[in-house]
Amino acid sequence: MSIKIGQASLGETGGHGQQPGNQTGRELNFSTWYPAVWLGVLRFKDPAKAELAAKACEDGVKNKNIGYDMDNRNTAYAAAKAVGWDLSKITKPVETDCSALMMLCAISAGVHKLEDLFRRQGNSCTTYCMRHDWPQTGEFELLTAAKYLKKDEYLLRGDVLVSSGHTVMVLEDGKHGEEEREVVEKSKIIVDGKEVSVERILKNGTNYVKVRDIAAALDLEVSNKGNIAVLTHKEK
């Protein structure tokens, strides 16, 4: 069974010249992941923001005042801004589209640099803009490995899938999601002005560095007593 997603799909009769609000009940909708020519996954670096974005997506889909129309895609932006980016509180019929909805969700989660981007562009992001400009905010990783694009097993709640013409938000972890929440990468720490290479582990938004890497950086011996690490100065 594929994982749940949220998306803005299509207006009552198409993509342009639509009536404000979710006329069909399916203009914004919940569905399940499906194979497509996904070009990237935008993953929040902060898991707390990923959760807020997913909640915003759920609120947006449930709010029948938000419909789909590419011509008036920014009316939902103005309405969301007026209510502090709480999509559940939009009370007048407005319009969005797939990428404009994702932008609302990200801003609702606290990615305020996207507000600056909107002001510069005078428009919500397209899918092209999402892939190129969102990572530059420093808030997202752009994942392009096949395991993220060809199946849903490694996706996390709050991930944003992007193709050339559509984008959706993941609302459930894939079956290997727990593995994804622990990321090991090469990093560095600075000791007395000198850079030392270490392995950094990111888990649930917290950074960890291996005791042995810290000991090596400080020129200490490391041993253990049971499950307790023991650091001692090396004999000169």
For the regions a protein language model found, what residue spans apply to each?
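Short beta-strand-to-coil "C-cap" segments at the C-terminal boundary of structured domains/repeats
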Residues: 42-46, 170-176, 231-236
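Short, structured beta-strand/loop micro-motifs enriched in basic residues and often containing a Trp
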Residues: 134-149
